[in-house]
Amino acid sequence: MKQDLFILAGPTAVGKTDISIKLAQKLNGEIISADSMQIYKHMDIGSAKITEAEKEGIPHHLIDFVSPFDEFSVAEFKEKSKNAIKDIASRGKLPMIVGGTGFYIDSLIFNYDFANTYKDEEYREHLKNLASEHGKEYVHELLKDIDEVSYKKLYPNDLKRVIRALEVFKLTGKTISEFNKEQDIFDIPYNVYYFVLNMDRSKLYERINKRVDIMMEKGLIEEVKSLQNMGCTPDMQSMKGIGYKEILYYLDGKLSLDEAVELIKKGSRHYAKRQLTWFRKDNRVNWIDKDQYKDDTEVCNAIEEKFLNLKNNL
């Protein structure tokens, strides 16, 4: 029998945290975070990490456990999440994936396993060198003639995935989407119940701007200063997150404070747009428009009802 897996996703600042706590209480669940910034220690304000008080006693997994000096891969997330899902289920609880990092979520609900197959390290290095010499756009353009779907879907900055698409074509003669279809990507050990929160874009952008102002008031500059004093630099994976890189540039005198704050807001709004685009590509998603409900309690009731109906109709 397949394990039930509940997913609550949505763009940054849409209000996932509060709703996830209410749902975990209703559904007897524990939360596995799918957030690529909340994994890091010492990075609480800029990642909007949930506090102990906000957890209201609900156990959380995969939060605050990676050093900002370390890299953390999607493969590692998948492995740790699978272990957490087993652990939660063994105690009779519902595993709940909550977050906005789409490729973390996809690693669990698609049957992607490239870790030990179809690799060509030499070709990867060659493409990385091309990107260093000629720019990421140059490597992205290589996709145009061989895999137009990936060319249109992937941004030049998403170099890892661009290289992966080129690598799969070189090794198999197939586009990555064709290759994935043949791998039976929906053959996973879970019954997936996937909900994505959304709201009117102007309201969401207002919430994002307000959230950034609150982060500044809470001491984001001091948090980044502390990380800088620890030895963190802009080239580290952890420091490339929105909010951290801009404040680092401010501290280094490359931006004024107003410029840094405006860039954080702008970057967060663009990120929210990309997140929504990502979630829209999965037809298993049940969209929840928060504007249709009076408050979070009503939102939770609607999600709970939909979840139970889906379970009963399996």
From Swiss-Prot:
GO biological process annotation, one example: tRNA modification
Keywords from the UniProt entry: ATP-binding, Magnesium, Nucleotide-binding, Transferase, tRNA processing
Enzyme kind, highest EC tier: transferase
Keyword Hydrolase applies: no
Family annotation (Gene3D superfamilies): 1.10.20.140, P-loop containing nucleotide triphosphate hydrolases
GO molecular function: ATP binding; tRNA dimethylallyltransferase activity
Binding site for substrate: T12, A13, V14, G15, K16, T17
EC number(s) per entry: 2.5.1.75
Family (UniProt): Belongs to the IPP transferase family.
Function: Catalyzes the transfer of a dimethylallyl group onto the adenine at position 37 in tRNAs that read codons beginning with uridine, leading to the formation of N6-(dimethylallyl)adenosine (i(6)A).
Subunit architecture: Monomer.
HAMAP family: IPP_trans
Protein name listed in UniProt: tRNA dimethylallyltransferase
Organism phylogeny: Bacteria, Bacillati, Bacillota, Clostridia, Eubacteriales
Gene coding for it: miaA
